[in-house]
Amino acid sequence: MPIDYQHLISLRSTGHTRRYSDRDTMLYALSIGMGRDPLAGTELDYVFERNPLKTVPTMASVLARIPLLKDCGYDYTKVLHAEQHLVIHRPLPQDGELIADARVIEAYDKGADKGALIYTETTARTTTDDEPLFTTTSGIFARGDGGFGGATGPSPAPHPIPNRPPDASCQIRTREDQALLYRLNGDRNPLHVDPELATRVGFPVPILHGLCTYGTACLAVLKTVCHYDHTSITGFDVRFSAPVYPGETIITDLWQDGNIVSFECRVKERKVTVIRNGKCTLTDSSRGEPQ
């Protein structure tokens, strides 16, 4: 069934509730690479509830997961994550219940031989006070599903990366089984676990979830710039440019200008850039120098 543009852009979902526990918060942190050294107290605060448990800001991408685009006409097995944007209105609680509303913002037709670029937005608030918590915008690229008559103009311009050597770099090696761990957050797409399916759609092995790479980039910023202070991040935006294979090493290059941290991620083993045009927005009180 081809994509129906008018149906697609009319999609809305309101009042979607999501309850999560401190177990979910710790699982997310572990699944993006936090806590590799269990003796390092800085990361232990994200995976051990002895102190007030810290929350990784990009966990919002998991909490915002709503099946808004289910049965929209594209081939689910060929979908790639293109972009992810996040605005944190206040730090995520370690547990709680959320109410989320989601909508399709736009769908760009990149041509029948290319695909469709679809943007959705999700806003979440807490049930305790009904105050905004975060807003996420997600862009997916449905390969081979173009030619449906959607918008043909340019998609939003990316964040520019400074034209100078990076101020700092952070190296994080992913685990061979990291996709198996990350999928427990709720993304059961078989592309990340089924070797036969991965080969059928053009990958040598199952790929790491784009949002896992996204979380790993956030870990790099927390570690290198924020001194592990999760409350210092108020925005986190990326463009995905290539997949990561589990077990590869992600190097995050960072540039800091005031409260804006620009970053890009590359795979050490293949010398491939996997995240471009990254932008992390910090609170005004978090303008320290990269470590």
Model regions and ranges:
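Hot-dog-fold acyl-thioester-processing enzymes
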Residues: 1-83, 149-153, 158-228
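HotDog/MaoC-like acyl-thioester-processing domains
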Residues: 1-14, 81-170, 240, 244-247, ...
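Beta-strand-rich recognition/accessory modules
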Residues: 216, 220-223, 228-231, 235-242, ...
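A residue-level detector for conformationally permissive "hinge/kink" positions
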Residues: 21-25, 194, 202, 234, ...
